[in-house]
Amino acid sequence: MAQLPLDLQFISAADRDDFIIGACNRLATTWIDRWPDWPGQYRILNLVGPPASGKSHLGAIWGVRTGAVTLRSSGDANAPDEGRHFVLDDVSVDDGWDEEALFHLVNRTANDGGSLLLLSREPVSQMPWKLADLTSRLRAVTVARLEPPDDAILRQLLEKYFADRQLAISLPVLDYMVSRMERSFQAVQTIAAAMDRRSLAERRNLTLPLARDIMAEFADGAHARQQALPTQTEQTGSQEEDS
């Protein structure tokens, strides 16, 4: 297993106060806040949800709090030499996780009084592991699901994205976007970045006409052309490097 940083591209800070809570993620957040009071002999929590659902953000918050090491499968059968608490990112049978290494990490963490936070798209207890002992261990894992966001969460996430980049956007524009966008965290990231790029490229404010253009492009798939354009954050970073 190799150590990899969590994906913090859409996060301004791995701070508990920076995480937006709603019905979709309240249970998962409650379990993160309850640590180290996690049930079971092995003290393992499994956060389950689709990509960009907030699993990595919660993992980062927990990692900062516990000093956890973040791991992702790379074909290495040896568990890390240091650490008592671990975040295992994007756990999946299909992604080549070494079952023997995972089994030994579960046992070692329990013996050391540590904890495991498993991030996955489906419950690890329902995955078709071949190793019977590992399957037995994972059946006892506590599961907390992150559900699709509601309108209130989508609006707050959009506000946060633009506020973090010091970009002004009005409530009517936000309401327009929320009423027409897909109910997913991934959609927030993609649409907000597209607005950011178009605003920079065309030197336009984040207005209702711009939002209409972006949402129309997402409806017909033309937004893919915008991916080659830099966001204001990316351009600022480039200018700083050149100076």
Where are these regions (language model features)?
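Post-Walker A helix-loop "phosphate-sensing" segment adjacent to the P-loop in P-loop NTPases
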Residues: 63-74, 82-83
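C-terminal helical "lid" of AAA+/P-loop NTPase domains
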Residues: 175-179, 186-200
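Conserved nucleotide-sensing/catalytic segment adjacent to the nucleotide-binding pocket
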Residues: 80-120
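Walker A/P-loop nucleotide-binding motif
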Residues: 40-58
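A short, basic N-terminal segment
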Residues: 1-34, 38-39, 200, 204-243
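Short regulatory helix/loop adjacent to the ATP-binding pocket of P-loop NTPases
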Residues: 124-139
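Conserved small helical "lid"/interfacial subdomain of P-loop NTPases
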Residues: 150-170
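Conserved AAA+ ATPase "SRH/arginine-finger" region at the nucleotide-binding site
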Residues: 141-153
